[in-house]
Amino acid sequence: MGKQKREIEYDCVARGMVRYLHIPARKARLLTNMIKGMTVREALNTLAVTPRPSAVPAIKRLLLSVVASVDRKAHPNTDDLIISKVYVDGGPMLRRIQAHAMGRAFRIRRRSCHVTLEIGE
């Protein structure tokens, strides 16, 4: 494994969370690790050209929601704010049954996740 990135502490300006997102945590982490530490403008541009269509709309909606909740008087230019922290936690699994050969049944686990995003300066 590579070296752990050292996180820089930013003052939290706004925080948002989406729960029970019907995307596996592993797929969501690929995107969130990519945009962590970027400015809001860079993150939106990166999400626009990312070839991972399953998680992009949900992460983009969350990012725009957090940007909308920023106090405009204290921070008039929201494009320069930095994504300071992003967590993706596993959510509950929906278990489904798929019929298989010789009367067997296989389990299908439909995974979900919770995503938390913080914007700082």
For each of these PLM feature ranges, what is it?
Residues 2-23, 29-30, 34, 38-121:
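Structured, basic alpha/beta domains of bacterial-type, RNA-associated proteins
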